[in-house]
């Protein structure tokens, strides 16, 4: 019997880069096949070929034994294939129901029957165990909720082949469990699934088989993971041993650099108060909706401050805009890289230099292109940013390399004082994480106060000098590195009455 999906010697070349070279593996009906590899290894490129976004240069894709060409996303969908990319695709001003039924809304005489659409979507969401308001507009939903909409869209199309690219990167523990149940149900229903994740726990929990990519090549395939140690997968992914991904080392701390006192914003239920010292890394942990990102955006001037006070190096700090924050040496690497972090149509060099340009104007008026080129080349080499050259459009880089470019932007700032990192390694592979942690430590050694928001508890525990836990829009507690462990942090993060054991 033919495999539900087969990749046969797939090749893809971009200018200056061989993105895929000789990729061959099968996915059976009723199987979850994991794909692992560093950012830029070619995993997402393969899914874009499967989804009709890119055209392959060599090889073939077979669905149920038939060779297929997907000149468009519509052709892929018509063949029973659904690809859910890490960078979500939705219409922000349409409702959940309208996004889910886009292109096939029920109508009569040319008029869309919205009530019928909403009822149908509510029934299907309930059957899938997903708690979403069918009438809510997508722009009002969290990133986690938008991701669930994309997953539900594939299920509503009854796709027989489903590819998921980092589907849990923004999901809460509860939402992740809902997704896992859906994946298990789809496997039992005989669907073929491709599952890309950098999270080892997910790969071992869900996947029947696994293929490893490195630098566009297929370096290993495992028909079963039952007897494959995690260390083997890491070594195959990165081509080297990584014994301690966090490589934490204590450092000398300076005086208090950033102080928040009774800070309030539209999404913060109680005044938030905390300090961060020069050279200190303070991790902020909390469940989805705890208010961490909202607090960071208030500090950065991206959201309105309704009360409380900020101080920088002991002096009152009045920030009314993000421009004010940057001028005072406070920067933010946002959670949503695509929408808020990068300038997608600009080059890697332009993205790195976009903030520090004001320091390097010739005669106070003209851009110093030579200086910008040297700055970009220096950080591309220092941070090992995978790009053909500094002129490459940043949108063509992997998520991990885009994040490195954003960090390079702030490393190039001469007067940096506070760095806020919101989910700095979301959707990034283990090798790139290792390198990004090194950048964070380097910023701390320079005397920057580092505030790191992360939903990955091992990361918070592994990198932070101190941990602040948020719950339901307020600070629930604080733990020193020496007293912090998973149970202690979760007991602060969970709603009152729940315990870490219950989670």
UniProtKB/Swiss-Prot annotation:
Entry GO CC: plasma membrane
GO MF, any single term: ATP binding
Keyword annotations of the record: ATP-binding, Cell inner membrane, Cell membrane, Membrane, Nucleotide-binding, Repeat, Sugar transport, Translocase, Transport
Location within or outside the cell: Cell inner membrane
Domain ABC transporter: 5-240, 253-497
EC annotation from Swiss-Prot or TrEMBL: 7.5.2.12
Binding site for ATP: 37-44
Pfam family, one: ABC_tran
Protein name: Arabinose import ATP-binding protein AraG
Organism listed in the record: Burkholderia mallei (strain ATCC 23344)
Encoding gene per record: araG
């Amino acid at each position: 019997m033919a495999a539900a999906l087969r990749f046969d010697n797939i090749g893809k070349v971009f200018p200056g880069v061989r993105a895929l070279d000789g990729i061959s593996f099968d996915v059976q009906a009723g199987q979850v096949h994991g794909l692992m590899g560093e950012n830029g290894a070619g995993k997402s490129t393969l899914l874009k070929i499967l989804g009709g976004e890119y055209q392959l240069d060599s090889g073939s894709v077979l669905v149920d034994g038939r060779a297929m060409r997907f000149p468009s996303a519509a052709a892929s969908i018509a063949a029973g294939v659904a690809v859910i990319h890490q960078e979500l695709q939705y219409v922000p001003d349409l409702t959940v129901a309208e996004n889910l039924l886009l292109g096939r809304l029920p109508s009569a005489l040319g008029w869309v029957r919205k009530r019928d659409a909403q009822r149908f979507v509510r029934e299907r969401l309930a059957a899938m165990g997903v708690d979403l308001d069918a009438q809510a507009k997508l722009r009002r939903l969290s990133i986690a909720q938008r991701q669930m909409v994309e997953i539900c869209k594939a299920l509503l199309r009854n796709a027989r082949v489903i590819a998921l690219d980092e589907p849990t990167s923004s999901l809460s523990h509860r939402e992740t469990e809902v997704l896992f149940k859906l994946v298990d149900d789809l496997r039992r229903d005989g669907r073929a699934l491709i599952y890309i994740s950098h999270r080892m726990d997910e790969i071992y929990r869900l996947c029947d088989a696994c293929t490893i990519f490195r630098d566009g090549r297929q370096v290993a395939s495992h028909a079963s993971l039952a007897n494959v140690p995690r260390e083997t997968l890491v070594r195959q992914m990165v081509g080297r041993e990584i014994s301690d991904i966090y490589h934490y080392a204590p450092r000398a701390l300076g005086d208090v650099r950033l102080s928040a006192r009774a800070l309030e914003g539209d999404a913060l239920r109680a005044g938030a108060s905390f300090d961060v010292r020069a050279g200190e890394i303070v991790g902020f942990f909390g469940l989805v909706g705890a208010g961490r990102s909202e607090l960071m955006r208030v500090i950065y001037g991206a959201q309105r401050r309704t009360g409380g006070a900020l101080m920088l190096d002991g002096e009152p700090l009045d920030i009314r805009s993000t421009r004010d924050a940057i001028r005072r040496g406070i920067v933010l690497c946002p959670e949503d890289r695509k929408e808020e972090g990068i300038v997608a149509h600009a080059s890697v060099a332009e993205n790195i230099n976009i903030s520090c340009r004001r320091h390097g104007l010739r005669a106070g008026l003209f851009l110093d292109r030579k200086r910008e080129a040297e700055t970009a080349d220096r950080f591309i080499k220092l941070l090992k940013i995978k790009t053909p050259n500094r002129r490459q459009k940043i949108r063509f880089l992997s998520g991990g390399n885009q994040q490195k470019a954003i960090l390079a932007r702030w490393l190039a700032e001469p007067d940096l004082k506070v760095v806020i990192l919101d989910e700095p390694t979301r959707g990034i592979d283990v090798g790139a994480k290792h390198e990004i942690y090194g950048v964070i430590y380097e910023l701390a050694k320079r005397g920057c106060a580092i505030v790191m928001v992360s939903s990955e508890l091992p990361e918070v525990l592994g990198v932070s000098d101190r941990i602040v836990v948020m719950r339901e829009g307020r600070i629930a507690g604080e733990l020193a590195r020496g007293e912090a462990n998973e149970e202690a942090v979760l007991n602060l993060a969970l709603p009152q009455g729940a315990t870490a054991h219950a989670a």
